[in-house]
């Protein structure tokens, strides 16, 4: 009876089921050679399809039989048999070879003998013919799969669509998938819904064109009961004219995943709205843990978000079928490592771990990056970070905890050793225990930990919302270099409304050099802050810096000399400055301070500067004038101070000035007489008080106490 049923089914390439279409793709693409299809066997090697007695597959024809019984429609008479096969248990008992891989490198030009029909599809009748059983490869390998794209596969590989299924313990090797004009594509499966995929290793080539979700292993994986574990991809993946998400393992990941690895080279072009990641193009409302990427991730032209582990992180809400909110869904990446080179010269939002993070619903879940590390080189246009390029969260907080970067990070603006750019409305958010050892290079706005930060304070916020950001216990030893603009050993530039949205930088240390090849504002901890009253708010300090230590050197120009040299005798060539006049005319000019370069509404308390400040303008050294703590050369004016370069004290509200901005109880070992240059400040004001010069020996002891 069973053989008769199979014989009948083999003839049903007819009215319903999945048909092998031979139509050309709707977008222009290279002509793809076709192969023939292997003839399915009449029966499996053994078994009855139950958990205790699974169907056994030992030949390629028996594997093709599995595709046949899943993909074809059944009449009512054979409904029970359909359910048995669709929900059945299957095991491989031998390695399977569809095509000899000896000429694998030429398959895109010359088709091998056989093409493969994926297991599970969407039929031309609109029904889903999904695999819903259990497939256990038992450690065996399926090799030589050829999927030319102009078939009914919908971008499928070994499987097309799986739902409420388990696929485990199987490897795919020397296989080629070409997908054009498909929703999802992957060499193991195009779509996995509410399924468990475990211990699957995939090696081969994937070529995508005009595909939405694409991955080396899976195109889309999601669902309340879904999980990916211990899966990997190696080989190459190229994508062109893609508008969704592309990843080395999974294109769009919306379920818990752990132990994923990518060793393949990923390349994207002509896809300005596509997110690209070494593991996943997007990670949404789930946790990705203990995963790694060693493959190169390259966006040849402008792309969306690009990252070593994932392109885009998104938190949100999980919906029930009736449209009601089921859960508030957070997104977390933890214990993940990238060592691959990340290159996206024409793209914003580029990171060693994640390209970007965002959310789109009020009161939705938090975004967290924890215990992650990057050693790969990261290059982008702007919003570039060793860990994350940009976090722009309008509706929830974020946490970056115990993350380390040792790779060089380079871009034009908003570049950071840990994060390039952050913006948050609802907090509190934190960067805690992070470290950068890699070089950070930008045209402007660069920081050893964070390049550029803003608390957005949108009009719709509740009075109880807080956008506060804390940068705690972070360390930078990497060199920070800008062409001009603003740079800091910890934070480059802060744009901030102040008040309840203040930024707190505490117990952080910088030992890296902070250098500008031209002009700019340089700080050992903070480069500069544009704050409250400048944009219509005057609600207290915008930034608090406490118990921070700088041991890094600040410098300008290529021929830096020690700016702590004594002032020349009267009648010398150098000129003193009219302090107030210069401050008024050069508020956007250069300033260098051991802790802060130049800032509005910033409180600095109990900090230590052990670093030097070196200055030059071309071939003319700039020397310090102790009277004003300002120095001038041929064509530049630089305001300098042991703690604070240019203290932009606001004289509009002297009675409340201390609450908004002050420099107190700080220590320094540098050569300048004054802790700060403060052109608007009257002498002996309490806003600058209790600061002192100490010996290097005292500084060592004090630094240990501050950083405990």
What positions do the PLM features span?
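General helical structural elements
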Residues: 7, 24-25
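Sec-dependent signal peptide recognition
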Residues: 2-9
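C-terminal motif of bacterial Sec signal peptides marking the signal peptidase cleavage site
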Residues: 15-17
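Surface-exposed repetitive/solenoidal architectures
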Residues: 22, 28-708
């Amino acid at each position: 009876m069973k053989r008769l049923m199979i014989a009948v089914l083999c003839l049903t390439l007819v009215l319903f089921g999945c048909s092998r279409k031979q139509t050309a793709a709707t977008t222009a693409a290279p002509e793809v050679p076709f192969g023939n299809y292997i003839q399915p066997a009449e029966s499996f090697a053994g078994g009855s399809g139950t958990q205790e007695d699974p169907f056994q597959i030992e030949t390629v024809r028996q594997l093709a039989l599995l595709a046949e019984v899943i993909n074809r429609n059944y009449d009512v008479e054979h409904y029970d048999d359909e359910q048995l096969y669709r929900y059945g248990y299957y095991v491989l008992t031998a390695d399977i070879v569809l095509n000899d891989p000896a000429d694998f490198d030429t398959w895109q030009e010359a088709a091998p003998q056989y093409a493969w029909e994926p297991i599970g599809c969407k039929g031309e009748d609109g029904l889903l013919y999904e695999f819903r059983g259990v497939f256990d490869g038992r450690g065996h390998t399926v090799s030589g799969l050829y999927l030319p794209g102009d078939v009914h596969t919908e971008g499928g590989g070994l499987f097309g669509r799986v739902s409420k299924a388990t696929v485990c313990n199987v490897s795919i090797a020397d296989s080629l998938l070409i997908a054009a004009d498909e929703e999802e594509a992957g060499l193991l499966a195009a779509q996995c819904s509410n399924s468990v995929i475990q211990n699957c290793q995939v090696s081969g080539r994937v070529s995508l064109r005009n595909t939405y979700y694409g991955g080396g292993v899976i195109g889309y994986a999601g669902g309340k009961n879904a999980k990916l574990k211990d899966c990997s991809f190696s080989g190459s993946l190229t994508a062109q004219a893609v508008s969704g998400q592309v990843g080395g393992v999974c294109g769009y990941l919306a379920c818990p995943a752990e132990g994923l690895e990518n060793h393949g080279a990923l390349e994207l072009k002509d896809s300005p709205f596509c997110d690209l990641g070494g593991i996943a193009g997007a990670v949404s409302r789930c946790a990705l843990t203990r995963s790694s990427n060693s493959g190169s991730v390259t966006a040849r032209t402008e792309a969306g978000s690009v990252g070593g582990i994932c392109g885009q992180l998104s938190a949100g809400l999980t919906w029930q079928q009736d449209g009601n909110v089921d859960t508030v869904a957070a997104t977390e990446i933890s214990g993940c490592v990238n060592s691959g080179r990340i290159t996206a010269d024409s793209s914003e939002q580029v990171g060693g771990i994640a390209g970007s993070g965002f959310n789109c619903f009020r009161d939705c879940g938090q975004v967290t990056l924890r215990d992650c590390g990057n050693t790969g080189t990261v290059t982008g246009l702007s919003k570039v970070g060793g860990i994350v390029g940009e976090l722009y969260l309008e509706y929830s907080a974020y946490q970056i905890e115990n993350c380390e970067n040792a790779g060089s990070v380079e871009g034009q603006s908003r570049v950071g050793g840990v994060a390039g750019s952050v913006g948050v409305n609802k907090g509190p958010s934190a960067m805690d225990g992070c470290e950068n050892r890699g070089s950070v290079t930008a045209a402007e706005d660069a920081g050893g930990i964070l390049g550029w930060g803003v608390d957005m304070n949108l009009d719709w916020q509740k009075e109880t919302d807080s956008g506060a950001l804390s940068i705690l216990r972070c360390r930078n030893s990497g060199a920070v270099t800008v062409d001009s603009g603003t740079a800091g050993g910890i934070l480059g530039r802060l744009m901030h409304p102040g008040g309840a949205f203040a930024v707190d930088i505490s117990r952080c240390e910088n030992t890296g050099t902070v250098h500008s090849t031209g002009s700019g504002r340089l700080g050992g901890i903070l480069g500069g802050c544009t704050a409250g009253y400048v944009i219509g708010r005057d609600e207290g300090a915008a930034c608090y810096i406490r118990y921070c230590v700088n041991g890094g050197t600040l410098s300008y120009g290529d021929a830096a000399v020690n700016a702590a040299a004594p002032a020349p005798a009267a009648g010398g060539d150098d000129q003193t400055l009219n302090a107030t006049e210069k401050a008024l005319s050069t508020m956007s000019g250069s300033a260098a301070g051991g802790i802060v370069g130049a800032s509005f509404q910033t409180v600095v308390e109990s900090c230590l500067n052990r670093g030097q400040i070196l200055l030059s303008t071309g071939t003319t050294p700039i020397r310090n004038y102790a009277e004003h703590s300002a120095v001038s050369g041929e064509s530049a004016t630089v305001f300098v101070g042991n703690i604070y370069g240019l203290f932009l004290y606001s004289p509009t509200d002297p009675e409340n000035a201390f609450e908004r901005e002050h420099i107190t109880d700080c220590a320094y070992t540098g050569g300048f007489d004054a802790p700060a240059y403060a052109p608007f400040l009257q002498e002996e004001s309490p806003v600058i008080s209790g600061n002192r010069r100490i010996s290097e020996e005292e500084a060592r002891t004090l630094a240990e106490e501050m950083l405990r």
